[in-house]
């Protein structure tokens, strides 16, 4: 997942889609099938790899989800890489935002429902993990 988050061609991490206000708020979740443990984060703005933070939530906290400033604070406390929010922005995503705003149509198209970037894996012993 970190490879996808670091690649500006994907809409997770660097290259994330902007909010209507022109900011990037990132989400990530992870689940481990054997233990059924899960961790997730929402509205992260400073954590370079939100999937790493979701894993920390799963492994190092009593919570299943953290959001916003509290999630970024937890990330910094756990020593995860922090970046300026501008790190996530790309010219292509900014162009897409401006194109959508110029159309002056509904921001949410009910016919175009897409999820986030995801990955699943099965180990040699049949253990399944998803992120």
What residue ranges belong to the model's regions?
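Alpha/propeptide regions of enzymes that mature by internal proteolysis
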Residues: 1-131
């Amino acid at each position: 997942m970190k490879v996808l988050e670091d690649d500006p061609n994907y809409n997770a991490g660097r290259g994330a889609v902007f909010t209507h206000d022109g900011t990037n708020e990132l989400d990530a979740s992870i689940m481990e099938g054997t233990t059924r443990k899960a961790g997730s984060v929402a509205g992260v703005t400073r954590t370079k790899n939100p999937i790493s933070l979701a894993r920390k939530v799963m492994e190092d906290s009593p919570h299943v989800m953290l959001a916003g400033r509290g999630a970024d604070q937890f990330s910094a406390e756990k020593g995860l890489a922090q970046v300026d929010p501008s790190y996530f922005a790309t010219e292509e995503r900014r162009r897409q935002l401006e194109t959508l705003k110029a159309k002056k149509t509904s921001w949410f198209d009910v016919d175009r429902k897409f999820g986030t970037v995801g990955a699943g894996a099965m180990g040699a012993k049949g253990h399944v993990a998803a992120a």
